Design a protein with these regions (language model features):
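Short, Lys/Arg-rich flexible segments
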Residues: 1-150
């Protein structure tokens, strides 16, 4: 979070010069760029620090079905579940409804039921949303593009 506070202290005075509608427009654009980057990173199965996600656990009876061979979180990264919002005071990227509950279990490595009435399992920690190395530069580039377009 130290990177975010340094970014905020640098950008804050520039944003104060904008009208609230202009800040909201900029925040929406930043949130959309971050949403796109988060979705791509989830598709690559990488955490914000660049490490690979922990693999799925092997089942006791190995089944060679399609689900086991596909990437994890394929539907979570869709814009239907991964939303971006921005207003005059903030830009945010988040999961909604049931997707938020699933993402939280994986993000924090919690215990959850595999299916209703099924066994409870501790999931490996897989950081889905986070501030990656390139995200700070992405925010700065979006800000500079917005300010140069005024």
């Amino acid at each position: 979070m130290d990177e975010l506070t340094s970014l905020e202290s640098w950008i804050g005075p520039l944003l104060q010069r904008l009208e609230p509608a202009g800040r909201a427009r900029l925040a929406r654009r930043i949130a959309q760029d971050l949403q796109r980057a988060q979705s791509e990173r989830i598709g690559q199965q990488r955490a914000p620090d660049g490490s690979q996600y922990a693999r799925r656990k092997n089942q006791k009876r190995q089944k060679g079905g399609r689900i086991r061979r596909r990437k994890m979180f394929a539907r979570l990264r869709q814009s239907k579940h991964l939303k971006a919002r921005g207003n005059a005071s903030e830009a945010s990227v988040f999961f909604i409804r049931r997707a938020a509950a699933i993402a939280r279990v994986h993000q924090e490595g919690l215990v959850d039921q595999v299916r209703r009435g099924g066994p409870r399992v501790r999931y490996e920690r897989r950081e889905l949303l986070g501030f990656a190395d390139g995200d700070k530069q992405r925010v700065i580039d979006t800000l500079l593009n917005h300010l140069s377009g005024l």
